[in-house]
Amino acid sequence: MRENSWLSYTEEDDKNVEVLAQEYKEFLSKCKTERECTQYFIKEAESHGYQDLNKLIAQGNRLKAGDKVYGVGMGKTIALFQIGKQPLTEGMNILCAHIDSPRLDLKQNPLYEDTELSFMDTHYYGGIKKYQWVALPLALHGVVAKKDGTVVNVNIGEDPADPVVYVTDLLIHLAGKQMEKKGSVVVEGENLDILVGSRPLAGEEKDAVKANILRLLKEKYQMEEEDFLSAEIEVVPAGPARDCGLDRSMIAGYGHDDRVCAYPSFAAMMEAGHVDRTSCCLLVDKEEIGSVGATGMQSMFFENTVAEILALMGQDSNLAVRRALARSRMLSSDVSAAYDPAYAEAFEKKNCAYFGKGMVINKYTGARGKSGSNDANAEYLARLRRIFDDNKVAFQTAELGKVDYGGGGTIAYIAALYGMEVVDSGVAVLSMHAPWEVTS
């Protein structure tokens, strides 16, 4: 077993860890959706000299070694590049992570009233234990796109003066039959509706509580009920990330999966000096539901962005794109399950991740015989071992859990379709996919 890194830290290391942890907690507390993450990264990148790719294309500017550029996909995914001295066709060093997290999404017609209580209907996003999302203070984050083209940002429940919303649960005194159900159905997905009001609007004879909610939304966001049809509003745990443990050695918060990988990947790009080989940080959406859609890893966004960059370097050919991608090397950063002694039966101790033992390398993920995994090449792993050891980087190797106990997938296999070297790597997490997760 690897040494606990806390034991080898110097006083300066401890200070650096504390600084990074504080910055990360601020990010995690503010950025709870893929849109919010992307906007944060754009602002920070521009302050570090990165330029918008679309503006460079419009101006016909050429790219050269040392230039920094970013491309954005529909406000939900972002790719950042620092051009190296070597030709881009020799490949890139890529850090990739996802910025979506499990949550509840409002349906397109969400608002209703029942017995003078007003609710909003939701559809859960990603793999969740549905019973974990009841009886918690929740917040609303998202956007409302109106017919006139304006887009209104929604954020309710994060300011201490804000109200929160809530999914009700059945009191234990009446829950005899409920407690006999399997965990997967003890709370049904269709019952994950958020309670948003109970005060009727004076003068309204029908659905007066709902009418009052609509009045409040119109006052604050100038929106009508029909505007829900073109809204993307996510229901997430309310409140900031917190230090966890009496020794403050851990962080509890929403969205560690996968922002605990996305944030340091981005930070590494911002701190990088001049590079010989082009560096890239790719932060994508929709991983939790299969990397689908125009902003997921299965889309053409990344390939198209690389093609545009090559064109600005005078290499406007399909072959150049293929060579640049095939000769790249990627760390596909996603969280790994940390060993939990309370559920020891799910883990194989020799091949699992532990807090304090360094970043986690997963040669493969998947389930039922590695199905759906990338399975990194031994030669690539040897190369990474040498780099990590030469630079005194603490790392460990792990599988998700015991064979045939379950499994999971990442974006690694999708990137590997280009022929590049890819390995899963990331951070160990306790209570993965819960509303509040814990990392070291």
Which residue stretches match the model-derived regions?
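N-terminal hydrophobic/helix-forming segments and targeting peptides
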Residues: M1-S440
